[in-house]
Amino acid sequence: RRLGARRDPVVLCGHTHTPRIVQVAHDDGRTTLVVNPGSVGVQAYDDDDPYEHRVETGNPLARWALIERGAHGWSAALMATAYDCEAAARQAEAAGRGDWADALRSGRVGRLEREVVAVAAR
């Protein structure tokens, strides 16, 4: 629906931080490959704008997509690559953002904080 009358063979999008590939079929028989690679450096966050929501990939890997044009049209693959997430987390902590540091290390919102509370309660 959001593509409207567009019939591009490939549409790249982002901002949601959610890795996803969708093939959209149009009434005229053509298709559009819609690719969102996810996020390179923000694998988890929560927000209340425009509504309360949480996005988590479950690990700290940097996300990206490989898009190729072959004999049978376009294809895409979602990729994940390790990087020095600990260095990024330390930068977040130095900036006073422990919440971001936890997300950078784990790919989850508040996970490390919950684990610390659970261990302390034992």
Feature-to-residue mapping (PLM):
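Short secondary-structure capping micro-motifs at structural edges
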Residues: D8, T16-P19, Y51-H53
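Active-site neighborhood of phospho(di)ester-bond hydrolases with catalytic His/Asp-centered motifs
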Residues: V10-H15, V34-G38
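Acidic, His/Gly-rich catalytic cores of divalent-metal-dependent hydrolytic chemistry
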Residues: H26-R122
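Short active-site oxyanion
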Residues: R7-V10, S75
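Active-site-proximal segments of metal-dependent phosphoesterases and phosphodiesterases across multiple
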Residues: R1-R6
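Active-site environment of divalent metal-dependent phosphoester hydrolases
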Residues: L12-V24, V42-D46
